[in-house]
C-alpha cells in the first residue's frame, strides 16, 4: 500500500511517497491553481497514483497520509476565519481588548492595537469566585435570548470564556447546550481549550479556536472526502500540530494548527541531523512565501504563550521565527 507525507506551504506543496514496493518518490506542485484543481495535496496524491481527474480512488490503496498545512496560518494572516461572537462574564466585556497593557514601544504616541478576531461580545449574567464557588447563578434565559439574536445576525461560531471557568465548568457547559440547541456550528469552551488560570490568555486562545476551527474542519473534511477516508480509500489521515506531534484528522483543532506547516520542518531537520550524530543545529527553511528559522541543542524548543500575526494565544508550539522573505517574496521579474 502507498504512504504519503505532504507539506502544503503557501506557494508550493511538496509530497514524498513510498510505493508498495518500498521505492521513495517526490512530487511538487503549486499550492494554489484553481483552474486545474481544488486542493493541491489531493491533486498531488492522485497524480502520483496515476489517476485521472474523474477516476475513483481504489479501495485499500493508501495506508496513510500525514500532512502539515498552512490553511490555519493563512486564515489567521488574512483574517479569513469564521465570524465569531465572544461570551464572557458580565463586567469583563473589554478585557481581551485591554489585554495585559504590554507596550513593546513604550514611547510611541501612535499606538496601533491588533485587530480582534471576534466581532461581538455578549456579557453573561453569572459569577464564580476563585475557589470555584458560585456567587451568581447563570441566567440561562438571558443567554438564550442573546444567542438567538447573534444567530439571527449570521454568527455560527461562539467562544465562551467565563471568569474562573477553568475551576468551575458547569456554567460554560450550560451555555454550550443552549448554543447547540439554537444551531451554532462551532462552540469553543475555555475550560476545554485552555483549562488554566489567567482569563486573558484563556479567552484569547478560545477565540482563536472558535475563529479557525470551522475553516480547518471544512478543509479536513474536504481532504477526507477526496481521499475517501471513510470508505476505505485511505486507512489513516493525520495532521501535524504546532507542537511537532501528529494527531488524527478528527482531532485537529484551530489552536493547534497555527504552525502545522513549519513544525514538520523542525522535526525533519532534527531527525536527519541525529542520523549524522549532529546535536546542535540552526534550521533555515526558506519556502516560496516565508522563511522559518529555528534552533536545536539537544531538545526541541517550545513556547507556551506566544503571539502570531498580532494574536495572543496559549498553546504549546515550536519556537520558530518567521519572516516574510520567501523566494517568491524577495524575487521579482524584469523584462
Task: Give, region by region, the residue ranges found by the protein language model.
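N-terminally biased helix-coil "hinge/interface" segments that flank
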Residues: 1-335
